[in-house]
Amino acid sequence: MNSFGRLFRVNVFGESHGASVGVNIDGIPAGIPLTQEDFLPDLERRKAGAKGTTPRKEEDLPFIKSGVFNDHTTGAPITILFENNNTRSTDYEKLREFPRPGHADFVATHKYGGFEDYRGGGHFSGRLTLNLVAAGVIAKKILGPGISVKATLKEVAGLPDAEQGLEAAIAAKDSVGGIVECVVEGLPIGLGEPFFDSVESTIAHAVFSIPAIKGIEFGAGFAAARMKGVEHNDAILDASGKTATNHAGGVVGGITNGNPLVFRVAVKPTSSTPKEQHTLNIKSGEVENFSVKGRHDLCIALRVPVVLEAVAAMALADFMLLEQRSNRVFKN
């Protein structure tokens, strides 16, 4: 559904062209310093406007509606709203007849019987990643300064140079995908459970809430399939668990081993592309040529790093609370 987490529980709501999108977060320890300004750096990283991103610009100011008093968390659920002001819903009126390839238009209509808000992708829109970033800001505070969560763009359109990848997309007049890597340092040994609540499965669960994510790998990932066992195994060097290599990506048996947690995600090309495509005309029953109008990202991967950090922090903050490594009352 629309919720994630066991103790640090995140619930997202809203639609792209509705009045607002927002997030409700339960399980936050009391006493964490928190103001509107704390959210701004990460929200700014997610914003549109840079080369290769959508021209749609919103202020993206977080309005804290509950759970904060005297600039500190109270221990009650926190609700944060983001207003939608720069919408152009007329761009989407034609979509009732032409479901966009690669988007949720067709399946959403079938699942919700045509009652869904289709404007701008509705509840399926990447705009709802604002909610994830906001939750991630709080999650990072729970993790504390000793744990760093950092994601970087590694590849655009198959090229390690993002600028070159974007230029290739502009020349082709088409959208492109990318690869983003996240590294978490400072984690204690022992987070995670075997099987269904492993660190990998929990992070993957959160990661796939980000629209456009099509794959994830930890450590050596798919390259491990081409390695020998002695090559892939990480030799343990000392009692702290430090290893000579990190092909496991910081997780063994679903449990953190004290080495950096490393994973990468594949981000598909933006489904809304300037190129003419063909799709079913629901009204006529015929497959017809179709082009997507509106304001869209050329490469959504450019805006994914801060969102990836957020969902990783959400998952790890939940583990920290479950392991009682974070107190219910925050202490500096």
From Swiss-Prot:
Subunit structure and binding partners:
Homotetramer.
Name the keywords, alphabetized: Amino-acid biosynthesis, Aromatic amino acid biosynthesis, FAD, Flavoprotein, FMN, Lyase, NADP
Entry's SUPFAM superfamilies? Chorismate synthase, AroC
Cofactor descriptive note: Reduced FMN (FMNH(2)).
PROSITE patterns registered for this protein in UniProt: CHORISMATE_SYNTHASE_2
Give the protein's recorded name. Answer: Chorismate synthase
Q: Which family does it belong to?
A: Belongs to the chorismate synthase family.
Q: Which organism is it from?
A: Chitinophaga pinensis (strain ATCC 43595 / DSM 2588 / LMG 13176 / NBRC 15968 / NCIMB 11800 / UQM 2034)
- Where does this protein act, in terms of pathway? Metabolic intermediate biosynthesis; chorismate biosynthesis; chorismate from D-erythrose 4-phosphate and phosphoenolpyruvate: step 7/7
- The top EC class, named as a word, is lyase
Name the gene for this chain: aroC
- Which residues does FMN bind? 123-125, 253, 268-272, 295
Which Gene3D superfamilies does the record associate with it?
A: Chorismate synthase AroC
Source lineage: Bacteria, Pseudomonadati, Bacteroidota, Chitinophagia, Chitinophagales
